[in-house]
Regions:
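Electropositive, glycine- and tryptophan-enriched low-complexity nucleic-acid-binding patches
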Residues: 1-4
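Acidic/histidine-rich catalytic cores and adjacent linkers
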Residues: 13-16, 23, 53, 57-175
Length: 175
């Protein structure tokens, strides 16, 4: 397989290791839909607290980012959210064991997820002018849903139809 310009991934750790071993210099674009799902899983679908509602809204806005200006605006909105709720996210609770832990642990995890992706430059790789020019395409993908909903879905559907098939037969049927 020739080296790609960019890889879109859902963020699985196995893929990250394979990328590091195989194509260490290739740019990574985290699937924005999967980032949205990750944040929604941590904030819940109907957050009760204002910081959770705002972060969920920001996650939804992430899917609408199509231009460098949109990406810049999203990042500014996120940084404003983080500054606005810094004190809230820093709150700690003392447990019976004497341990101090984050009071709003899931929101802190969601914040850390976004921080990491921004620091690593994996949220808006698909908008990189250099990659667009090198690819010769008008746009680069921001999600891997075309792959998951197209090619992989057909394989999963076939496996569903033949549930009793032994593992090796399923592997052979997929190829």
């Amino acid at each position: 397989i020739s080296t790609p310009l960019m890889v879109v991934t859902d963020g699985g750790s196995g893929f990250r290791k394979a990328m590091k071993d195989t194509w260490p210099q290739v740019r990574i674009q985290r699937c924005l839909f999967h980032v949205y799902l990750n944040i929604t899983a941590l904030t819940s679908k109907r957050p009760r607290l204002a910081p959770g509602r705002e972060l969920k809204w920001l996650a939804h806005q992430l899917l609408a980012a199509k231009t460098p200006k949109d990406a810049w605006q999203w990042e500014q909105d996120y940084l404003a959210w983080e500054a606005r709720w810094a004190g809230f996210l820093a709150e700690k609770s003392v447990y019976a064991t004497g341990e101090y832990k984050d009071t709003h642990a899931k929101l802190v995890r969601a914040r850390n997820l976004v921080r990491t992706l921004l620091r690593q430059g994996q949220l808006f790789t698909f908008l990189s002018p250099a990659l667009l020019a090198a690819s010769g395409l008008e746009t680069l993908p921001s999600t891997n849903n075309r792959l998951e909903g197209g090619i992989n879905a057909q394989i999963r559907r076939m496996w569903g139809w033949h549930r009793g098939m032994p593992f090796l037969h399923r592997v052979k049927a997929a190829y």
